[in-house]
């Protein structure tokens, strides 16, 4: 799927794969392999997107807990503009499934993190509800931001009242909690100002950004202005769990800007 950009890649490969995790036997096999690979790599801390399925996401947390790794794991929320097999009925159903998952997500080292996939697949009501849940329970948040130009254009249609992508999260309170935003490849200056003001942590994912032709994040500029930036492998758009490979790619692509 590396011949596709983000949105086409999601529809052609990622969403069909994620739909399979409704089957717990499949989820156990796939997540077992993932956790084993992670354990064998140089990674000891991970922040992970699950799928929309509460039971499968809890299973992933159980496997990570047993591995000895320290992690944050998110049950994904999506109630619009995604395949029917993954689309939750509405905001209320998505929030109820999240509460169900949180009730079972009680581990010493695998912690929950709220995970709206991205603005295009989440209604305003869902984003607002997740923001309220984050504030009420003191939970961190992770999502995607300004990864791809097509994605950014897609946000403008359902959110005409916002001047830039991150405002759609911020007006729902999702940047007010401890927050990780993946990618941030195409953040305009005013978006960078907001991320800095809210203390958002950027997960720079150079392997996946190269593989999906998303662009090269201006990480040196982000660091110079005091933004917090770390590295992410972003499986499976990134092809390895090994963060040493990610470090090498970050250096390599930074020379091309």
Question: Regions from the language model: what does each represent?
Answer:
Residues 42, 64, 114, 144, ...:
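Divalent metal-coordination and catalytic microenvironments
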Residues 31-38, 201, 209-211, 255-257:
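C-terminal helical cap
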Residues 187-200, 205-211:
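Long hydrophobic segments that form regular secondary structure
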Residues 76-79, 147, 206-210, 235-237:
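Short, acidic/turn-prone active-site loops that include or flank metal/cofactor-
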Residues 2-69, 94-107:
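Alpha-helical scaffold segments that flank or form the walls of functional sites
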Residues 171-178, 220-257:
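His/Asp/Glu-enriched, well-ordered alpha-helical/loop segment
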Residues 46-47, 141, 230:
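Hydrophobic residues within beta-strands of alpha/beta enzymes
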Residues 55-185:
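Metal-coordinating catalytic core of metallo-dependent amide/deamination hydrolases
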